[in-house]
C-alpha cells in the first residue's frame, strides 16, 4: 500500500527539543545538528562573547549580549529522508516556563549530559515535565574531548536518578586528550575521532569489526584491549535497545561524543530519524486528534515578542497537530469563536523568517499576533475543541514591581498583562492592596521583563522583595465554603493576568496549614491555559 502524498509528508516529520543543564553544550549541539542538516555551512561557536560569529539560534538583543538562548526558537532542516523540527529551549541558569511549555509541543526529546558532571539539577526538572506525557528520550553524553567520569557510572546515575533504563548504542574509546572515537554496538564499527575538525563535517575513518587488527593500530593496543573488556561488561550489564520501550519513555538510547569536536552528533541524528515517532495524536477536551486527519488543527504553545527589532510585533508559535496549512486558509480561533484568514504564517530558521506556503503535522508555524492570541489557543477548521496539556506552572520566585514615574501605571499594567499572556512572566494583583507582584520560574525572567517594559512600553520600574514563597490556583465546587474561604483569606488572595483566583502563600508552612484547614478547596500547581 502506498501512502497518499499527505501521509508521506506526515511520516517524514520528526519534532524534538533538547533538554540539558546550563553549559552541558546544548547550543553547540544545536549548531552541529543544523550543520548536518545543511542549514548552516559553518557552525558559529557560542563562546567568546565578543566574537562576531554569533550562534545561529540565539537572537534576541539580550541573548546576543549574554551569550545565552533566552527564547525558544524553532529550526527546520532535512536529514536523510526526514524533515526535522528542532525546538530550541532556553538552557541558561535561568530559564522560564517557556522551556516547560515547549516540551508539550514535541514528540521526542534529546537529553544532553556533560559527561564530566553527570545528571544535574535542571535536567531533573525538565525530565519531570517530559514525564507528564511519557515523551521518548534520546541521550547524548557530551564533552568526551575532556576528561569524563566512568561511562558505566554515568549510565547508572541516569538510571537511578531519572528512573529511565539506558541502552548504550555507541561506546567511547578513551577520553580527554586520549579520546580516540566510539564503537557502535549495533553496527559493529569503530568511528575514529580527529581533533580540530569541529566547524565542518569531517570524513570519519571507520574500522569494521571489533577484532580487526586495524583497530589496535588506530587506537593503540592498550585502549583497544580496554575497549574489548568494557564491551564484555556493557553487553552483560546494560539493556538492549527496544523501540517499544523507547516510545513509551521507559528506555533511552545513549550516544557518546563531543559536540564541540562535531563527533558523534550524526550517530545520534541517525537514531533520531530512525526511531523517534512521526507526529503523535493529541488529546482535546472531547476526543483524540490523529495526525492523519485531513482537517487542520493546531495549538499555540508560546508567544514571542519582537523577533523583528524593527517592528513591535508578537508571534504566536503554533504546533500543527493534523491537516495541512495552506496560505490564505480560514481558521477558527476556538476560544473567541472568530474565523481568521491566515495568509502570512512564518517558518523559522532561528530569527530569519520566511513566509510559509504550507505546513504539515509536527511543523511549527508562526502567526502574527496583535494581542488577540493567547497561550493554549486552539485553531481548527470549524470544529469546537480545545487541546489540553499546555499548562501554566506555579511560579517559584516573586518580586513586587514599582514605577519610577507613578503616572505610567496604565502602561505598566498593559505591559505586564501582555507579557503574562505571552508566558514571559506571571502577574498577580492582590485583592487587599494595589501592589503588582510578578512571579517567575527563573530569575532571568525578571531582567527580561524589566528590559522589555523599558524598550517596548517606555516604562521604567524597579523591583522590591516581597514576602511570597509560592502561589497556587484555587477553586472549589461548594460556593458557600468558597465564599467563607475567600472572606477569611482575603489578605493572601490575588488575581493573575487572566483574572484567575490565586492563593499567595508567605511560607510553605502557611500553604500546608491552609490546605489542611480547607480540605474542600483545591490548590493547583499547574493550570490549563
UniProtKB/Swiss-Prot annotation:
Binding site for GTP: 20-27, 88-92, 142-145
Keyword Transmembrane: no
Keywords for the protein's UniProt record, in alphabetical order: Cytoplasm, GTP-binding, Nucleotide-binding, Protein biosynthesis
Gene Ontology BP terms: regulation of translational termination
Annotated ranges, domain tr-type G: 11-280
InterPro entries with a match to the protein in the record: EF-G-like_DII (IPR053905), EFG_III/V (IPR035647), G_TR_CS (IPR031157), P-loop_NTPase (IPR027417), PrfC (IPR004548), RF3_C (IPR032090), RF3_dom_3_sf (IPR038467), RF3_GTP-bd (IPR041732)
Role: Increases the formation of ribosomal termination complexes and stimulates activities of RF-1 and RF-2. It binds guanine nucleotides and has strong preference for UGA stop codons. It may interact directly with the ribosome. The stimulation of RF-1 and RF-2 is significantly reduced by GTP and GDP, but not by GMP.
Protein name: Peptide chain release factor 3
Lineage of producing organism: Bacteria, Pseudomonadati, Pseudomonadota, Gammaproteobacteria, Enterobacterales
Gene responsible for this protein: prfC
Amino acid at each position: 500500500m502506498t501512502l497518499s502524498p499527505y501521509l508521506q509528508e506526515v511520516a517524514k516529520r520528526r519534532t524534538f527539543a533538547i533538554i540539558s543543564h546550563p553549559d552541558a553544550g546544548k547550543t553547540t549541539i544545536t549548531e552541529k545538528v543544523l550543520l548536518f542538516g545543511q542549514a548552516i555551512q559553518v557552525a558559529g561557536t557560542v563562546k567568546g562573547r565578543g566574537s562576531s560569529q554569533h550562534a545561529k539560534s540565539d537572537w534576541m538583543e539580550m541573548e546576543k549580549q549574554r551569550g545565552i538562548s533566552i527564547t525558544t526558537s524553532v529550526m527546520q532542516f532535512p536529514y536523510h529522508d526526514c524533515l526535522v523540527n528542532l525546538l530550541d529551549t532556553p538552557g541558561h541558569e535561568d530559564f522560564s516556563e517557556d522551556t516547560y511549555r515547549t516540551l508539550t509541543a514535541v514528540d521526542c526529546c534529546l537529553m544532553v549530559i556533560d559527561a564530566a558532571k553527570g545528571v544535574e539539577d535542571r535536567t531533573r526538572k525538565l525530565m519531570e515535565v517530559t514525564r507528564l506525557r511519557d515523551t521518548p528520550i534520546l541521550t547524548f553524553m557530551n564533552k568526551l574531548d575532556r576528561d569524563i567520569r566512568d561511562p558505566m557510572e554515568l549510565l547508572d546515575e541516569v538510571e537511578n536518578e531519572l528512573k529511565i533504563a539506558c541502552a548504550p548504542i555507541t561506546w567511547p574509546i578513551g577520553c580527554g586528550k586520549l579520546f580516540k572515537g566510539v564503537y557502535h554496538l549495533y553496527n559493529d564499527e569503530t568511528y575514529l575521532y580527529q581533533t580540530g575538525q569541529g566547524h565542518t563535517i569531517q570524513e570519519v575513518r571507520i574500522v569494521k569489526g571489533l577484532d580487526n587488527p586495524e583497530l589496535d593500530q588506530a587506537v593503540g593496543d592498550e585502549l583497544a584491549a580496554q575497549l574489548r573488556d568494557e564491551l564484555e561488561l556493557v553487553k552483560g550489564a546494560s539493556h538492549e535497545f527496544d523501540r517499544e520501550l523507547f516510545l513509551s519513555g521507559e528506555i533511552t538510547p545513549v550516544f557518546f561524543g563531543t559536540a564541540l569536536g562535531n563527533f558523534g552528533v550524526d550517530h545520534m541524528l541517525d537514531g533520531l530519524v530512525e526511531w523517534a515517532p512521526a507526529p503523535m495524536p493529541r488529546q482535546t477536551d472531547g476526543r483524540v486528534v490523529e495526525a492523519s486527519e485531513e482537517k487542520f488543527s493546531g495549538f499555540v504553545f508560546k508567544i514571542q515578542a519582537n523577533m523583528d527589532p524593527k517592528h513591535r510585533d508578537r508571534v504566536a508559535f503554533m504546533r500543527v497537530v493534523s491537516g495541512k496549512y495552506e496560505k490564505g486558509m480560514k481558521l477558527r480561533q476556538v476560544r473567541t469563536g472568530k474565523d481568521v484568514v491566515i495568509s502570512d504564517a512564518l517558518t523559522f530558521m532561528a530569527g530569519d523568517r520566511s513566509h510559509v506556503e504550507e505546513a504539515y503535522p509536527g511543523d511549527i508555524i508562526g502567526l502574527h499576533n496583535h494581542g488577540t492570541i493567547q497561550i493554549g489557543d486552539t485553531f481548527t477548521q470549524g470544529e469546537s475543541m480545545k487541546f489540553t496539556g499546555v499548562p501554566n506552572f506555579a511560579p517559584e520566585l516573586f518580586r513586587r514591581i514599582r514605577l519610577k514615574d507613578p503616572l505610567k501605571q496604565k502602561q505598566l499594567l498593559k505591559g505586564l498583562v501582555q507579557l503574562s499572556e505571552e508566558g514571559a512572566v506571571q502577574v498577580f494583583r492582590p485583592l487587599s492592596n494595589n501592589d503588582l507582584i510578578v512571579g517567575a520560574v527563573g530569575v532571568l525572567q525578571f531582567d527580561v521583563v524589566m528590559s522589555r517594559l523599558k524598550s517596548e512600553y517606555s516604562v521604567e520600574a524597579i523591583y522590591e522583595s516581597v514576602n511570597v514563597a509560592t502561589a497556587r490556583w484555587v477553586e472549589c465546587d461548594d460556593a458557600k465554603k468558597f465564599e467563607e474561604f475567600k472572606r477569611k483569606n482575603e489578605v493572601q488572595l490575588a488575581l493573575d493576568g487572566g483574572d484567575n483566583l490565586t492563593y499567595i502563600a508567605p511560607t510553605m508552612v502557611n500553604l500546608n496549614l491552609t490546605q489542611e484547614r480547607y480540605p474542600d478547596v483545591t490548590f493547583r500547581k499547574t493550570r490549563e491555559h
